[in-house]
Amino acid sequence: VQSKAIIIALSKKTSTITFRIDEKYERGLRKEAEEKRISLNTLANQIFGDHVELDQYMKKFGMVEMSKGSFRELLNSLDEKNIINFAKSIGSKEPKDFILFKWKELSPQSISDFIKMYFEHCGYGMCDMETDDSVSTVSVHHEFGNKGSIFLKAFLEAIIQSTLEKEGDVKMTENSVTLKF
């Protein structure tokens, strides 16, 4: 699997482009690249990739980002019933609209791509995906405790119900949620 990823990465076409940027931005980018132990070119490619693949869609769609601490506080202020209702409400509307906006179709692949992108970009947790035959499995590890798992379970169930019109099989622990669909 790793050699396949390397071959795909090496087969991507690249192009050369030149930009003029403010010196303070250059210093900031060089510092960040050094801290991440990557080249300035790699960092720039990541920034451009994030913009093209995600940020422009998030902005056009009106997404609002929230810190992990604020999200944790929100969850802690709600009882279990309200957490489930909140998660189902947002999980059954915005994801479907966003997926259609970005990918133009509702398919297991576009749903999986959305979940991975959304969870990792929005800070809900680290996401691992597998697909065997016709079953996709999404595992999310997070830092929000039991109330976070309750929210994420209801959120993921609502996404699958509203997009694929089927039930997902969801398992949860205090800091992880696994969904099969």
Model-derived features: positions:
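An N-terminal amphipathic alpha-helical segment
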Residues: 69-137
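Short, hydrophobic/π-rich interface segment
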Residues: 119-173
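Short, basic amphipathic alpha-helical segments that act as recognition/interaction helices
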Residues: 38-61
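C-terminal edge-of-domain segments
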Residues: 172-181
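Short Lys/Arg-rich basic patches
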Residues: 1-23, 34
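Short, low-complexity, charged/polar intrinsically disordered tails
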Residues: 1-7, 59-66
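Surface-exposed, Lys/Arg-rich phosphate-binding patches that contact polyanionic backbones
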Residues: 9, 23-46
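Amphipathic alpha-helical core segments of compact helical bundles
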Residues: 26, 45, 49, 53, ...
